[in-house]
Amino acid sequence: MKAIVFVLIFAVAFAVTATHQGEILCNLCTGLINTLENLLTTKGADKVKDYISSLCNKASGFIATLCTKVLDFGIDKLIQLIEDKVDANAICAKIHAC
């Protein structure tokens, strides 16, 4: 009986819907873009590249998914969009994270 209860609790705890996963990924993405915008303004493009590289080397779960999307899109293109003052939600939509 304890095993069944444990399995049910475990299943419920990890039963995240695709919509909820998408919301999490989108929120992570917009937060990342805002962080990168601040970093780009204060430290420059090389620091943005270093930050993304460092983050992605340690990433797992949703962060790893986001890293894959960012790297597939291209860091230089991402930096250009940030420099062009494109909204974080629009950037995340372009990289298919929102």
From Swiss-Prot:
Compartments where located: Cytoplasmic granule
pH sensitivity of activity: Optimum pH is 5.2.
Domain of life: Eukaryota
One BP annotation, GO: defense response to bacterium
Keywords from the UniProt entry: Antibiotic, Antimicrobial, Disulfide bond, Signal
Pfam families the record matches: SapB_2
Protein name in the entry: Pore-forming peptide amoebapore A
Organism per entry: Entamoeba histolytica (strain ATCC 30459 / HM-1:IMSS / ABRM)
